[in-house]
Swiss-Prot record:
CDD domains: bZIP. It comes from Dictyostelium discoideum (Social amoeba). Probable transcriptional regulator. Residues 87-96, 144-154 have a biased composition (Basic and acidic residues). The lineage of its organism: Eukaryota, Amoebozoa, Evosea, Eumycetozoa, Dictyostelia. Residues 153-173 are annotated as: Basic motif. This is Probable basic-leucine zipper transcription factor P. One of its GO terms (biological process) is regulation of gene expression. SMART domains: BRLZ (SM00338).
Amino acid sequence: MNHRIEDITSNPSSPSPNSPFSSPQVSLQPSIIQNGLNSNNSLLNGNNFNLNGNITSSPSTSSSPPISTTTTTTTTTTTTATAKKTNSKEKKKTTNKDNNNNNNNNNSNNQQQQQQQQQQQQQQQQQQQYEEEDDDEEDEGGDDNTKVGKGEKMKARRTNQNIASRNYRQRKKVYIKEMEDKINSLTLENDSLKKDLYKIGNNPLELLKFSQEVVFLMTQIRRLVFQIDQALRNSEPDSSIKSLLNTWQSTMDQASSINEREIERFVHPYTQAKLTVMGYKPHTNPWTDFIKTPGQEDWWTKYAEKANLSSDQLEQINNLWLRFDEEERVLQKELTDLDEYIKKFFLTKIIIMPDTEKLNDIISSCLPIPENHDGDILQTSEVLEFIYNLEKLKQKFIKVQRLTWDTSKQMSKYLTVRQEAFLLVLVHSNTKYIHTNMDMTNNLWNQLNHSALSKTPSTYLLGGVHSSSSSSSSSSSSMSSSTSRILNNHGIPTPLSSSNSSPSSLSASSSIGESIHSYSQLPNVVQPIQTQPSSMFTPLPGAKPLKNQQPIDDLFFGTIPLSQVPLSFQQNSNMALFSNYRNFTQQQAQQQQQQQQQQHAQQHAQQQAQQQAHLQAQIQAQIMQQAQQIHQVQQAQQASQQAAQQAAQQAAAQQAAQQQAAQQQSPIQTQLSPPQHITPQHTPQQHIQQQQQHQNYQGTEPHLLGEFMFFNSIDATNSNNNNNNNNNNNNNNNNNNNNNNNNNNNNNNNSTPIDQLNEYRPDYNNNNTNKILPNIIQSLSASSNNSLFSHQHQQQNSQSPTLPPSQNDSVQFHFYQPIHQNNQNNQNHNN
């Protein structure tokens, strides 16, 4: 502010000390201006002017120090500022008045006026900004104390705002969390309700079933008892028996906890009300009915003798049981008292039933029956007392159960491991839960009462369904007589008259179930017989015969198996009841027969499977034997082939030696013999060349292997024959010529090409070579009559078979004959 003051003092236009503004009259001007501002306060507020700075600056001038050079300058600045503001305000007033006049006079020039107003508003905003800047500058020239106070106030305000916002956020988080928890709990409840509704929709009796945990624990307990029995019989050590007893105790603890949860369902008010209406009375504890005083029970004395219980053990167990008996009596008495109280509450407060006192009051008073159905409203104290008694009943049930289990645990302290195991097996030998029988009973119940009630209209009754088949029947007084008459009309014996008849005999009648309205299932809703209401003391009229009654067979035989069809029904009953227990025994016998048939069928199937397996094993054994025989035959053939080859080699060697000897003995005869009569004999070199040719053919045609082997053997035999004939020629020239001719023929036959044998060659894939080979060997061995080779061959191969004499000269024929002839020769040889 000092530089501003200097500017004002240095400005020539600023008033001098001798000017009229510096006179004492100047002190009156701010008050006058302030009064004018207060008078026009509403107008300034309408135009959004802020006069806080001017108003607050007035006390600062009044509270300023004594007048000096600086004070005069400040007063002059304030006066100039106020003068400017008054001028601007007067201008604004005039402009507003002009605008109002123009708006009233010139309605047609609204757009121009709006533009002018916008321009004026912009000018006014600019003026306001300038004025606010001036006011801020003037405020900055205030005292430092005011700045510090404002800063502290702003800090305090900010801190308060931060704290408030923080608290709000925290409250918001807590609220959101609470709402999420509520939503989660509602969703869980909704899911549980959906599951319950689904169960009730499928089968309303599912909630009354034993849970899967109970069934599992019962079967587990039964299995443990069996294991303990086996351990005792096998005389296992005490450690293993002790481990089994520990597992049994843990499973019993789980079963007791599950039973405590089941008690809550039975103590429910609705369940107790149903039991009260049905007239149910509680009985004693079934877990302790088999023993009351151990000293008086025969089985206990026998157990003590077999288990070798001492006198101390017997005394302690008897004392323990007496204490248990006393406590159980007290609990049973309390349970009966609570049961009587609960029944009385239900029968007097909720389900009002008649008693002698009420009947006497009604007879004595002769008052009319009140129209209202509701009785007196109960007080909260009575309801609370009833709930307390229900909770007390629950606790008593739990206490009885725990007392029994704790007593059994205490008894184990006085017994050894084997004695306890023996007692456990003895008591629980017959304690079991046959859940399969329970499921079968439940399924039959549901089938007769719920599952079949789906498609038939509700107007038809279970005991008397309207049908046209019994319209001609006479009147009767009961439903049982009408049903028996229907059965007799259709040729079916009644249950009372034919106790020995089985349900299968009922299916023999083919005319059963023929009616106009044939229904495949039971009616959906069972309704009572509609009769007119009668007065209390007037006798009821006789029962009229039902018209159009449908046969019972149409209702049951189409949907329920014959083993489960009831044969008679009571009047107006919602469920089917057997009239005679013999029918039920017959059904059981039929079920047993069916089970036996199934078992026989299973046994027969098992026997067939065993027979098939045995046959397969036999077939496999035969196949293995045949394979071994074939292998042996092949080995024998290979051995015979090898022996033939060896014999051929030996014969060739002998022939060579004989030729050399013959050449040395008669060189002149060999030289004089004519060349045209020399028979082409197979020398060893020619034999080797022929084998090479056969091998070449064998490379091109693998299936001719057997034929080449046969050629080799034939060549060897022919060469032996030639050698023998040559030896005879040395002695007889005439015979030599004939033998040479025979040798020529044999050589010509041996030189037959392979192409001529293709028509008669054996099939290699059918293994006919194995059949032809022995025939050729036999024919070769038989063809040499009185020759040296045949004699030597018979000596070397004495085990080789020989053919009959009629086949001695049939070597070539056997070799070139077709396959079927070879097979015939094989058959003849085998014979």
